């Protein structure tokens, strides 16, 4: 491949055309996954009858079924939906199940004394949740959520199976004009690595900050 071909593949096809779609897919899916995870995590953490069991089955399905099959199933069901919207929904459902377990674990880790104190003060359950419990959960769960975002970013490549024009699909199409698979997919690998590595570093710094500055300060005050 000539230098001009490298420019076309990297800048014109991947960076200018495919990367914006991929970033929109990441943003949409992460927001959707966080909403599913937060609502479901609260229900699971509070052990709401029936709903908690239903969500437990949903989590097990998402854990036990390959991501690609989830997207292909939604693609077959939502015949009038765009590939982008189906990809956002599918990835949101998949990642939301994992975030749900993170939030659930955070809620269950909150000291029972705080629940009892809130009950003694006759605080409504929604006040207890959103003023006392959820802020603590989000603080502790933030590094784990960053880690889940890294997995979500890597998982967006599965959207290529339903024709969503993210980076992997664009690279597959580019192969028809540029036969050097090592270069084309190598550029995709580099872009994904940069995004995931940057978030991994951020997650480690956040985890260190939470442990040293926030949790550490609380223990000192106690």
Annotate each PLM feature.
Residues 1-222:
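Transmembrane alpha-helices and adjacent helix-loop boundaries
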